[in-house]
């Protein structure tokens, strides 16, 4: 079986001492990868945490021994990020806790540079951060500035840009706002004294919107083609946030929820939302597609979803998301603090689970898909094993064998119309004498209930509503999940697609070109299936439309694989088969 590049276990490990965070990679002028990261012998924020580098000459397959940017005997130093200027000089920018205040988020913004592609590093320099209201009102009265940085600096018109949050309470992280650090003359500076640093926006108050709560952190910035600065960050509102600046960072729009191209808000827990611009001018957005409002648990950061962005009229149109990475074990720590790498037409992503970090080659067809969603309109035939219709109430027909869900998957696609949405009325079932298969029934609030079983009592993760993953485990013979409330209407022909991805163990629904995300009534629209799900085929493999089904299935297709979101969208745009 071909390796699934989305499975993080197939990634290439990045070295560390034990704890490892923010593995960010730049391509140096010699073609090698220079990875900077925060590491330490213990866990996060413990003694001897420091910033290091490592070099790969084979695109992440192997790495050099760790190179100290700061020694572990120095005051705690963290959250290193990197950028390379055209001359080849590499900069490492990080938080250095020189005053010894007991917080991993306290200290100066420091940087060093390397003129030999990361092998050796200069003395330490300081970025002067302007003292503002958030600093003066912090728990140290401004004597220490509390902040950190997850951003990857970007270069534009000779300057460097990176976003940060300033924090009121140090480690507690319960009151923060966004700021932009801009360094002018950065690209051509021969000596750090030639760089002019600005803390923006102008004035005493940073970038935040109290309507979305007190948490506005982990800012990261990209520059649109005409110079608009686009900043994204995490919140505890269940949504990522964005703001834009048209005047080089001096003023900013009121931060708002990020939204898809059709205006629906995107969802993300309190986890790093990362935006990245490729050399083709298109964007990727890393997020988790659920709206759990707090820190979350292992599940809230697994899987990772990615949305493709297309620039239009000084804004970004974000497409429907795909699963980029997953851990097949949903009980372990999820992935976060990513970076994206582009070299010679190929793409990679890095991530960390705090005790292990990896790099991952990205399937180029996945990126082509997310970047072309708005134009794709060809019907996808690869994997079709059944294509027929129309079917009305009481119809029966034989279907092919579906793949085992132990690594395999399937997709059910229907063009379907309801004359009524009467609760408990059967729509379609494949369950026979052995009670294996799937069953679709009309449920309350214009939803459909999907049930699936392989005949065994299985445990599966219910919707994620607590900090303990085990608390969400349910034992049941029949897995079930519903479409979002009110996504279906009477008298309309819907494009309804059920995707069962047995590799990632994720089941999802799409209706009329939209990936259902739980809307306003649930934290998510996708759902885990059991890790051990296998054969759901009954002996006779007969599908039956409900005897009292109030409607018509104009066309039904089965695929012997999971379809990507982008493929489903292409089918939707292609329209109902003639």
Model-derived regions: residue spans:
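Extracellular glycan-associated modules
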Residues: 377-578
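Beta-rich carbohydrate-recognition and catalytic domains
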Residues: 1-21, 26-75, 84-146, 154-218, ...
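Generic recognition of flexible, low-complexity loop/linker segments
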Residues: 218-220, 230-231, 272-273, 293-294, ...
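Structural motif
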Residues: 32, 89, 159, 228, ...
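Short beta-strand micro-motifs enriched in acidic
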Residues: 28, 83-85, 224, 278, ...
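Repeated scaffold domains used in trafficking and secretory/extracellular systems
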Residues: 78-81, 269-273, 336
């Amino acid at each position: 079986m071909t390796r699934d590049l989305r499975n993080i276990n197939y990634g290439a490990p990045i070295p560390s001492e034990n704890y490892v965070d923010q593995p960010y990679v730049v391509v140096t002028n010699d073609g090698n990868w220079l990875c900077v990261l925060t590491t330490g012998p213990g866990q996060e924020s413990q003694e001897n945490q420091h910033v290091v580098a490592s070099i790969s000459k084979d695109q992440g397959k192997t790495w050099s021994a760790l190179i100290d940017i700061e020694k572990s005997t120095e005051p705690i130093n963290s959250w290193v990020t990197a950028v390379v200027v055209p001359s080849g000089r590499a900069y490492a920018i990080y938080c250095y806790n020189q005053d010894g205040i007991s917080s991993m988020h306290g200290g100066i913004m420091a940087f060093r540079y390397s003129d030999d592609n990361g092998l050796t590093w200069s003395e330490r320099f300081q970025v002067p951060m302007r003292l503002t209201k958030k600093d003066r009102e912090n728990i140290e009265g401004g004597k220490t500035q509390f902040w950190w940085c997850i951003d990857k600096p970007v270069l534009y018109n000779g300057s460097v840009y990176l976003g940060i949050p300033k924090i009121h309470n140090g480690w507690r992280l319960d009151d923060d706002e966004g700021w932009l650090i801009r360094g002018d003359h950065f690209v051509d500076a021969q000596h750090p004294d030639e760089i002019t640093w600005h803390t923006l926006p102008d004035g005493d108050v940073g970038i935040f919107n109290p309507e979305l709560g007190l948490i506005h952190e982990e800012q990261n910035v990209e520059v649109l083609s005409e110079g608009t600065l686009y900043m994204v960050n995490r919140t505890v509102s269940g949504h990522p946030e964005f703001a834009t600046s048209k005047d080089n960072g001096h003023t900013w729009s009121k931060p708002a929820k990020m939204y898809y191209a059709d205006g629906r808000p995107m969802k993300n827990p309190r986890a790093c939302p990362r935006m990245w611009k490729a050399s083709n001018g298109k964007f990727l957005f890393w997020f988790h597609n659920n709206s759990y409002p707090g820190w979350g648990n292992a599940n809230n950061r697994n899987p990772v979803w990615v949305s493709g962005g297309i620039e239009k009229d000084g804004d970004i149109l974000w497409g429907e998301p795909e699963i980029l990475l997953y851990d097949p074990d949903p009980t372990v720590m999820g992935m976060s603090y990513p970076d994206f790498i582009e070299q010679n037409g190929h793409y990679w992503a890095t991530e960390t689970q705090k005790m292990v970090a990896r790099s991952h080659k990205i399937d180029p067809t996945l990126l082509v898909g997310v970047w072309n969603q708005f134009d794709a309109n060809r019907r996808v035939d690869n994997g079709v094993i059944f294509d027929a219709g129309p079917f009305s109430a009481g119809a029966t027909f034989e279907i092919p064998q579906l793949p085992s869900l132990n690594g395999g998957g399937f997709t059910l696609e229907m063009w379907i119309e309801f004359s009524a949405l009467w609760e408990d009325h059967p729509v379609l079932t494949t369950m026979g004498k052995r009670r294996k298969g799937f069953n679709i029934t009309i449920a309350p609030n214009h939803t459909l209930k999907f049930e699936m079983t392989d005949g065994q009592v299985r445990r599966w993760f219910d919707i994620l509503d607590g900090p303990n993953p085990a608390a969400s485990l349910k034992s049941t013979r029949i897995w079930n999940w519903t479409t979002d409330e009110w996504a279906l209407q009477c008298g309309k022909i819907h494009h309804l697609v059920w995707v069962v991805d047995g590799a990632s163990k994720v089941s999802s629904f799409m209706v009329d070109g939209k990936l259902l995300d739980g809307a306003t009534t649930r934290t998510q629209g996708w759902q885990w299936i059991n890790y051990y799900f296998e054969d759901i085929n009954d002996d006779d493999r007969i599908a039956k439309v409900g005897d009292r089904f109030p409607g018509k299935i104009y066309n039904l297709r089965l695929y012997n694989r999971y379809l990507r979101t982008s493929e489903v969208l292409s089918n939707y745009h292609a329209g109902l088969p003639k």
